[in-house]
């Protein structure tokens, strides 16, 4: 089994609430942490089955909705609109989520995995 946690983290770029989802195994010690970065026009819940699969194998999985995606919007009409800051703001949001992971799970070094658009963004950060 695993537990799901949802929260919002404030973007350092412009104060936008970034929606974050974590799936945490019930048993410890954890085998590791996986930070997922979704692609363009996607949303975090799409990866929930994979996150649950990995949690059953001992991995903490964390993903967030990019600005303008899923629940990281100020209004539903803003889906697809990334607000100010462009790519720099998206990269900053990924870093903020990563930093929060480090603070919450200090004994682990997270792995980042990008999917489609996320591949380019994680390569830029790593």
Describe each PLM feature range.
Residues 46-77:
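Conserved alpha/beta-hydrolase
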Residues 121, 125-126:
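Hydrolases whose catalytic domains are alpha/beta-hydrolase-1, hotdog thioesterase
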Residues 105-120:
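Alpha/beta-hydrolase fold nucleophile elbow
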Residues 31-33, 115:
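Structural motif
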Residues 1-27:
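N-terminal cap/lid segment of alpha/beta-hydrolase-fold proteins
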Residues 42-46, 89:
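Glycine-rich anion/phosphate-binding loops
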Residues 82-105:
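Alpha/beta-hydrolase active-site loop
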Residues 34-42, 120:
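Active-site glycine-rich loops that stabilize anionic/oxyanionic intermediates
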């Amino acid at each position: 089994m695993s537990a799901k946690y949802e929260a919002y983290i404030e973007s350092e770029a412009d104060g936008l609430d970034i929606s974050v989802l974590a799936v945490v195994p019930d048993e410890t010690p954890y085998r590791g942490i996986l930070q997922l970065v979704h692609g363009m026009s996607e949303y975090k819940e799409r990866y929930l089955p994979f996150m649950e699969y990995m949690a059953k194998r001992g991995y903490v999985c964390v993903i967030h909705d990019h600005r303008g995606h899923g629940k990281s919007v100020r209004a539903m009409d803003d889906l697809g609109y990334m607000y100010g800051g462009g790519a720099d703001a998206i990269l900053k949001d990924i870093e903020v989520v990563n930093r929060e992971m480090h603070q919450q799970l200090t004994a682990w070094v997270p792995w980042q995995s990008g999917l489609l658009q996320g591949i380019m963004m994680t390569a830029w950060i790593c």
